[in-house]
Curated annotation (Swiss-Prot):
An MF annotation (GO) of this entry: structural constituent of ribosome
Gene label: rpsP
Region spans: Disordered: 101-142
Natural source organism: Streptomyces avermitilis (strain ATCC 31267 / DSM 46492 / JCM 5070 / NBRC 14893 / NCIMB 12804 / NRRL 8165 / MA-4680)
Protein name: Small ribosomal subunit protein bS16
Entry keywords, A to Z: Ribonucleoprotein, Ribosomal protein
Family that this chain belongs to: Belongs to the bacterial ribosomal protein bS16 family.
Length: 142
């Protein structure tokens, strides 16, 4: 059985995501795969490439042939050079980590803002008004 390492397309129109899979060479592009060994997301900047190096080395060792796009990915990650015994390429560009927002606890959490309410509740206002009216009516009657 001829085995190929190829890309399986996922995602929406104009938003492709690929899985790097090992499949029989006669199966269709998005058909049944023997094993999934990586990811490739070309739309992200820089492109996201994750490859399970151990599984790639195994499949290349037993004779699986990578397609041209997969071969380019393997060369960028250095797995192809490792398999061939050549020097490794320059390291890949890694995305800068996003700035994290300060956590709720770091800003003081619930404890910082606790105190008495600035505005009074409506029920309390009505009770105060009713008490004031009843006391004023008692003082006028007496």
């Amino acid at each position: 059985m001829a085995v190929k390492i190829k890309l399986k397309r996922l995602g929406k129109i104009r938003s492709p995501h690929y899985r790097i899979v090992v499949a029989d060479s006669r199966t269709r592009r998005d058909g049944r795969a023997i094993e999934e060994i990586g990811l490739y997301h070309p739309v992200q900047n820089p492109s996201r490439m994750e490859v399970d190096a151990e599984r790639v080395a195994y499949w290349l060792g037993v004779g699986a042939q990578p397609t041209e796009p997969v071969l380019a990915i393997l060369k960028k990650t250095g797995d192809w050079q490792k398999f061939k015994g050549e020097p490794a390429p320059a390291p890949l560009l890694v995305a800068a980590p996003k700035a994290t927002r300060p956590s709720f606890d770091a800003l003081g959490g619930d404890d910082a803002g606790k105190g008495e309410a600035i505005t009074q509740k409506k029920k309390a206002e009505k009770k105060d008004e009713a008490a004031a009216e009843s006391s004023s009516s008692e003082s006028t009657e007496a």
